[in-house]
Amino acid sequence: MANNTLHRYLFEDLSVRGELVQLDDAYQQIISSKEYPKPVQNLLGELLVATTLLTATLKFEGSITLQLQGDGPVSLAVINGDNNQKVRGVARFEGDIAEDATLHQLMGRGYLVITITPKDGERYQGVVALEGENLAQCFEGYFERSEQLKTRLWLRLGEYEGKPHAAGMLLQVMPDGTGSENDFEHLEQLTDTIKNEELFGLPAEDVLYRLYNQDKVQLFEPQDVEFFCGCSRERSGGAIVTIDRAEVDDIIKTEGKISLHCDYCGTSYDFDSIDVANLFEQATSGNDTVH
């Protein structure tokens, strides 16, 4: 049974909030769009889990894009998610990548770009150097500098029942200032004991009971996480008519068709000479109507 859910919870007596995300299909769809080496799959998985955890903090309609850029074998890895937990992602890489490649071996000298885009309002963008030993530490550093809130992330990737899974947890001190450092460290130590198979295979309620049965935990309604690309034949056609007609005709003459490929979901859209003629005719008639 597919398990793609985000759970928010609150420690009632400790002024600490938490999140738990468990992903299978949503993660599998992202990494199946290309033949990614295992370390790149894992990198996308960690970025996906982090994006899902961060979008849960949005207090408005909008989206968060997490983008890794570097001069290593992986030049780009990006995940986009919105407040409805619709996610998509892609990575670009070159050359051979070792099975045990670390974050810094994958990205080289790189940085993390965090872009928050409200539906209404100004966009915010933060840039963080990849200074931590792993991606979780990079995000923890971001929270410490940008929000001054103690935050811990756990990002887990692995196989469960023969399929790739991704999961993660987040703990964060509430901004009311009443939480103690000892309380937070206590919860960190408990969360450190979680095993991958528990995160991948147990219901959220069981995970939280397994970790925090001595604490009062309020669990909120779950939110589904869904892979959503948004590409379509219509959008691809709209992109074609922005290209010079002579250039499009040259491609049709040489290739017999013009193809647009979606990096996010792997779908290809093919247009032959008749399709292209119709596209430009519709675009021209549309412009005439406007004028």
UniProtKB/Swiss-Prot annotation:
Family: Belongs to the HSP33 family.
GO biological process terms, semicolon-separated: protein refolding
Task performed by this protein: Redox regulated molecular chaperone. Protects both thermally unfolding and oxidatively damaged proteins from irreversible aggregation. Plays an important role in the bacterial defense system toward oxidative stress.
Gene: hslO
A GO CC term assigned to this protein in UniProt: cytoplasm
Locations listed in the record: Cytoplasm
Modifications made to the protein after synthesis: Under oxidizing conditions two disulfide bonds are formed involving the reactive cysteines. Under reducing conditions zinc is bound to the reactive cysteines and the protein is inactive.
Organism the protein comes from: Aliivibrio fischeri (strain ATCC 700601 / ES114)
Annotated protein name in UniProt: 33 kDa chaperonin
